[in-house]
């Protein structure tokens, strides 16, 4: 009986610790930290108005960021070709937005290549994120 209780306690502790580790990993960065990183790489702070213009402008092709994320990135968007629903991009409306640097890097790389036919510069990322952070309920 003692071994059973000891084993049950070990399983419970591991389950709790595993859940805490998963939560910590899911939010390993913040939008403000991402903005700081890209601003430093760009050598200038992110500019919200420049980010708004960039976000809504078609960049030589058929699409803009707003084509999928919506002109109001405070609401759900919809992928222009697949129709897949996209969560709000503005951090105040989606607490998970910009909290996983690997996902952020992956999606910026993919989406910038779709919209611009190249990767976004650090300044462009900083501007867009400054704009998204500026959007409040």
Enumerate the predicted regions with their spans.
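Stable alpha-helical elements in mature extracytoplasmic
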Residues: 47-50, 64, 100, 104, ...
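The canonical Cys-X-X-Cys-His
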Residues: 60-72, 128
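Bacterial N-terminal signal peptides that target proteins for export
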Residues: 2-12
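Electrostatic cytochrome c docking/interface patches
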Residues: 27-59
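Short microdomains enriched in Cys/His and/or Lys/Arg
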Residues: 87-102
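C-terminal capping alpha-helices of c-type cytochrome domains
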Residues: 105-137
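Short cysteine/histidine-rich zinc-coordinating motifs and their immediately flanking basic loops
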Residues: 77-84
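N-terminal signal peptide c-region/cleavage motif recognized by signal peptidases
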Residues: 21-23
